[in-house]
Amino acid sequence: MKRKIFACFIVMQIITGSSIGQSTDTTIGEEYRPKAHFTPAAHWINDPNGMVYYKGVYHLFFQYYPDSTVWGPMHWGHATSPDLIHWKEQPIALYPDSLGYIFSGSAVVDYKNTSGFAKNGKIPLVAIFTHHDPKGEKEGRDNYQNQSLAYSLDE
């Protein structure tokens, strides 16, 4: 019995070992990038702010400052994955604007169109997040943070 278990173990090692060398993950050879979770290719990343699954693809949004390796005006970065292992960076999802930086939040796929944003049969992806106005904060105003919505009909 032990020999059968050992033989099965060896066969499994051979099978799985042969597929490991065929990985197309570009981060495999990058010394300082983690292999077990997403990181952008460069610059500041902060907390994850929304993960949704839509049409066979996972979408991850995260606080991101694309211009430096230190904290700065927050954006929402975007990455996609078919399997939660292999990630592809996408263009930035949300940029700072006249209302301020893009802080923490969440995202949902609005299948039932409770937001009313659907158009021509396209299902909206709705992001709910905090706008942070650094000028208002410096001035001591009490309304320097506001809740905001953004949506997309892109697929």
Annotate the PLM regions.
Residues Q22-E155:
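Beta-rich carbohydrate-recognition and catalytic domains
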Residues M1-T24:
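Bacterial Sec-dependent N-terminal signal peptides
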